[in-house]
Regions:
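Amphipathic alpha-helical segments with low aromatic content
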Residues: 1-26, 156-157, 162-213, 373-412
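Short, recurring structural edge motifs at helix starts
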Residues: 2-5, 16-20, 70, 134, ...
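Short, solvent-exposed loop/turn positions at domain surfaces
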Residues: 4, 21-24, 67-73, 143, ...
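A short glycine-rich beta-alpha junction/loop motif
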Residues: 10-14, 88, 103-109, 142-165, ...
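Non-catalytic DNA-recognition/assembly elements of restriction-modification systems
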Residues: 13-41, 205-233, 240, 364
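Structural detector for helix-capping/boundary residues
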Residues: 16, 28, 129, 152, ...
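Sequence-specific dsDNA recognition surfaces
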Residues: 31-81, 218-236, 248-287
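A short beta-sheet element
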Residues: 62-63, 75-131, 150, 245-249, ...
């Protein structure tokens, strides 16, 4: 590929092009390139669902509990493979391509290209930042949850067009890149599945063996003081006292939290933390549980490491605990996030819309305590697997960033 000059407003050329292509691109009004198609009365066709960023999928494969009246299917719109769909969330995610023929909601607008083209070319273009945030945004009407794309405004938007042979080159590149990203994502999911199975195997074997002690949580762990600072009382960056927020425990942190390497929010300087004694500040080996969640992820925890010379407190909706005995670093982090331990928590969870677990309940659970050598072995195995998963995630991000960069440079 070669870098070329940017558009001067008269001749439009992308910044990056495949060899052999130098002709300027044309820009047509959307209605000149695409026909607004309304083709109804096909109730026997496959009902399709929009998956943002992925196009269409047969409704029964979408994994969603969507209710609809069979009698209304005659009013649904027919789409052909390669058509484009303006759906209810297009204002934030772009247009989606029909991956197969079928019928879709009558609320959608169906676009069919009038000129020779590559559908994958426009599928890529309709997901670029330039199109969504600088072009499509001109056709958005309404505010907040009422936002939608007005076709009457959309049809006047300028849409680029180049020779089909160049479109094919560009679409082939993104097809290969998308396939590579999909495989990388599958690798991450496979590694996570393997990790869960390995964790189950390791701790189930410990529970069945005679070389481990089974101890009561309340006899092994001391519950520490936590604070109730909200997100508004925290800042990202700085050298203040770190704060472990329950939302980060649930979503951001893994079984182990390294305070030296993780960017943990700090408590704003104007907040009074004088009531917290030295014993309240987190140390290596302490474990922080999230005691509230919107689902059964409640009880997720993270073990603290890298706490040397770093002041950190446990925050809102957390249960910070300190082991009374010596444990191998990271062992408790992996044990408390194992299915073996979580199964003990499930009967203790309270609430309907919001799930929670109390300190008085968690102290009744049991901890498997093998010898230090076995603890170290388990922690080492699980940590190495986490490193492998993190590396695979970073590769996924790098590939997505590469795709994003190419999307910006290969289109005008």
């Amino acid at each position: 590929m070669a870098n070329v000059s940017s558009s001067n407003g008269l001749e439009k050329r992308p910044k990056l092009r495949f060899p052999g292509f130098d002709e300027p691109w044309k820009v047509f009004k959307a209605e000149e390139l695409f026909q607004n198609v309304t083709d109804k009365n096909h109730p026997d066709e496959t009902v399709l669902t929009i998956i943002q960023g992925k196009g269409t999928l047969p409704r029964e494969q979408a994994g969603r509990n969507i209710h609809y009246d069979d009698a209304s299917l005659s009013n649904y719109k027919k789409v052909e493979q390669g058509d484009f769909i303006i759906h209810l969330r297009s204002f934030e995610g772009g247009l989606e391509m029909a991956n197969e023929a079928g019928i879709v909601s009558p609320a959608y607008t169906i676009l069919r290209c009038k000129r020779p083209h590559s559908s994958l070319f426009y599928d890529a273009y309709f997901h670029t930042d330039e199109f969504i945030n600088h072009n499509l945004s001109k056709s958005v009407e309404g505010i907040r949850d009422g936002r939608q794309i007005s076709y009457e405004a959309f049809k006047w938007l300028g849409i680029p067009y180049c020779e089909p042979t160049e479109q094919e080159q560009i679409s082939s590149l993104f097809s290969v890149l998308n396939e590579r990203i999909a495989k990388q994502r599958n690798l991450v999911e496979s590694l996570k599945k393997y990790k869960r199975g390995l964790s189950n195997s390791l701790f189930d074997r410990l529970s069945a063996g005679s070389e481990s002690r089974l101890c009561i949580f309340g006899d092994m762990m001391t519950i520490l003081q936590n604070n109730t600072f909200s997100r508004d009382n925290l800042s990202v960056g700085g050298n203040g006292v770190r704060n472990i927020h329950y939302g980060d425990v649930l979503i951001k942190y893994g079984a182990v939290l390294d305070l030296h390497s993780e960017n943990v929010p700090v408590i704003n300087a104007e907040q009074d933390i004088s009531k917290f004694s030295a014993l309240s500040y987190l140390r290596n080996g302490d474990v922080v549980f999230a005691d509230t969640a919107e689902d059964y992820t409640v009880g997720k925890s993270t073990e603290i490491i890298g706490a040397e010379n770093i002041a950190a407190l446990s925050g809102l909706h957390t249960i910070p605990c300190r082991p009374q005995d010596s444990f191998a670093p990271m062992y408790l982090g992996y044990y408390f996030n194992s299915d073996y331990f979580k199964k003990q928590l499930y009967p203790m969870i309270q609430g309907t819309k919001v799930s929670s677990i109390s300190k008085s309940e968690i102290i009744k659970t049991k901890i498997i305590v093998p010898c230090l050598q076995e603890q170290t072995r388990i922690a080492s195995i699980m940590s190495a697997l986490d490193d492998r998963i993190d590396a695979a995630k970073h590769t996924t991000k790098d590939l997505i960033d590469l795709r994003s960069g190419l999307l910006q440079q290969l289109f005008i």
